[in-house]
Amino acid sequence: MNTIELTPLRKGIVGVQFLFVAFGATVLVPLLVGLDPATALFTAGIGTFIFHLVTKGKVPIFLGSSFAFIAPIIEASKMWGMAGTLAGIAGVALVYFVMSALIKWQGRKLLDRLFPPVVIGPVIILIGLSLSGSAVNMAKDNWTLAFVSLVTAILVLTLGKGLIKLVPIVCGIVVGFIVASLMGEVDFTKVHEASWFALPGSLASFHWPEFAWKPFIYMIPVAVAPVIEHIGDVYVVSAVADKDFVKEPGLHRTMLGDGLACLAAAFFGGPPVTTYSEVTGAMQITKVTHPQVIRIAALTAIVFSVIGKLSALLQSIPQAVLGGIMLLLFGTIASVGVQNLIQHKVNLNNQRNIIIVSVTLTLGIGGAMLDFSLRGVIIGILMVSCLVYANAMKQGLVKVLLIILGGIALSTLIFFLLPGGESELTKMSGIGLSAITGVVLNLVLPKRAEEEDA
């Protein structure tokens, strides 16, 4: 998709619109875990600027508060307090740094082997569909308001011209907000109580994070799913912008930028940040993919974090109004995944491809969740390694069975030597679990000779 060329003024307007898209989720996460919403806005803006600095200003991605860490932050804060928990987020950054170094070391061949189109296509579809539940939950608070904002955005997209056509989301939110006000659904109490200018809470009473090993180690396995989702999001943005960001500036840079942004968020007292699919969906429908526009959104987030009344006004927008907009945005992300499968001519008449796509989608849409212990992780890695080795060696059936039986024997030994149920390491669900399943299936399922030649 070729991006629309805009004047500086129009870039500014669209940039503010993109923040409107990300605002709801960015401030909701800190509210759920007991952090300051204004600080989350500030760290989202700072984190996005760090990301753009590391990626040479080429990748149009906005970083906002990550939902993946809500439960871990709540549990960790009970055990080590919020100061220790924020220091533990450094463990999240470490996972990004290690993945960045691994990708830099192995290069594009590793990514092409782990994430061919038959894997990345359904993962992109899931990024959109997995968010659809959130959109519906927001919209069902008041379906009338949701449909008002949705229909307004659709009418602006299809009938609008000039500048108006570039801001369907703002139009939908503004019209929905006006209707909500007339219906008495908006509470302006916090707007009246908020001061005009104020530093975010964590900055006004800044204190250094208290480093401790236990929360640091606790957060490391939680970061696996966001890292996997990061890879999928970069592929989505590449498809939307019609540029190969995996190659230039490189996935190792995007991964490093995300990790440094998480580190900065912890330092300033905000939640971990992650790539925001909502903004990618907004880019898809507006056809605007300028990185400068995303940086304007980041700057707007920082400005809003210190203007109390503006921040409070945005927080007063009913969830149903935002939900109506999200119904449109998240569906467009899923359509990018379908386009990815079509553009790369993935043959869905092929049994191997059908298995990979169907299992990946079913696990993700069905909401599968697995608990992993240290024992389970080691056994899983061992068995997958045996299957990959057997597939790569192309031995006869007897030798393949012997390799697999050897893996089972070692796994049985590990099962009795290592603790299991009580030593839960992490939980995995959604996109992370589905993506890993797709990667494993792609590695272990044998290809026919004609597929390898293609």
Regions found by a protein language model. Name each.
Residues 12-22, 145-149, 167-168, 200-234, ...:
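Hydrophobic, membrane-embedded alpha-helices of multi-pass small-molecule transporters
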Residues 72-80, 157, 279-294, 300-304:
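Interfacial segments of multi-pass membrane proteins
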Residues 35-41, 57-69, 111-120, 165-170, ...:
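Short, non-helical or kinked segments that cap or interrupt transmembrane helices
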Residues 24-27, 151-156, 167, 187, ...:
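Juxtamembrane interface elements at the cytosolic ends of transmembrane helices
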Residues 1-13, 188-203, 239-246, 253-254, ...:
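Intrinsically disordered, low-complexity non-transmembrane regions of multi-pass membrane transporters
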Residues 1-61, 68-79:
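N-terminal signal-anchor module of multipass membrane proteins
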Residues 2-9, 34-52, 58, 220-291, ...:
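Membrane-embedded helical hairpins/re-entrant loop segments and their flanking transmembrane helices
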Residues 79-190, 298, 303-452:
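Membrane-embedded alpha-helical modules
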